Regions:
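Glycine-rich portal/gate segments that line the openings of hydrophobic small-molecule binding cavities
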Residues: 54-94
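Hydrophobic ligand-binding cavity/cleft-lining segments
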Residues: 1-60
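Eukaryotic N-terminal targeting leaders
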Residues: 1-3, 156-159
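Intrinsic-disorder/low-complexity, polar/charged segments enriched in Ser/Thr/Lys/Arg/Asp/Glu/Gln
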Residues: 5-9, 66, 115-117
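Intrinsically disordered, low-complexity terminal tails and linkers in eukaryotic proteins, enriched
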Residues: 151-155
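Beta-strand/loop substructures that line and gate deep hydrophobic ligand-binding cavities in soluble
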Residues: 93-147
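Short, surface-exposed coil-to-beta transition loops
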Residues: 7-9, 75-79, 98-105
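Beta-strand elements of well-folded, non-transmembrane domains
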Residues: 14-16, 73-75, 122-126
Length: 159
């Protein structure tokens, strides 16, 4: 069984200006979830060189939307599963061949007059060991991508 370990977590705050009142906050969260779904279906919008070759969408027994994606990055082809709920989006890559298992999750917190916080959480197979300088570069790339995603969402939310 693959054991995943946390490797990086950070958050980006979206200001509450467009979220006054419970109904408005709920509407913003629904729109934000739709934007994150759009990003999951079209990652090339923010990640140059990463394309979805195919996406199968369905609703699981718990009521979450699930995307089974086939992704292409250069010559590499891999699969993942994206699970979208009201307050969380999880990208899960299974272990296949040379690629170790990993997850990337975005949690939505706050709203209703409070700032909306996007918490980004990364986990990977505990056997993955990277040199410190590579780990640092990867972390910077993740953080930049997440900040770009949050800014893109804020722009489309009118925040």
């Amino acid at each position: 069984m693959t054991v995943l370990r946390p490797v990086f977590e950070h958050e980006v705050t979206l200001p509450a200006t467009a979220m006054e009142g419970e109904a408005a906050a709920a509407a913003v969260r629904v729109r934000l979830a739709a934007l994150l779904m759009q990003f999951a279906k079209h990652p090339h919008m923010l990640i140059e060189g990463l394309h979805c070759r195919s996406v199968k969408e369905y609703t699981n027994d718990a009521g979450a939307t699930v995307l089974e994606r086939e992704l292409v990055a250069g010559h590499a082809v891999f699969h993942d599963t994206v699970t979208v709920t009201e307050d969380r989006v999880v990208f899960a890559v299974p272990e296949t061949g040379d690629m170790k298992a990993s997850t990337f999750a975005i949690s939505l917190e706050g709203g209703d007059g409070k700032d909306l916080v996007l918490r980004f959480h990364y986990e990977e197979d505990e056997t993955v060991k990277l040199p410190a300088h590579i780990e640092g570069l990867r972390t910077k790339a993740w953080k930049a991508k997440d900040q770009d995603l949050a800014a893109w969402c804020a722009k489309h939310l009118g925040i």
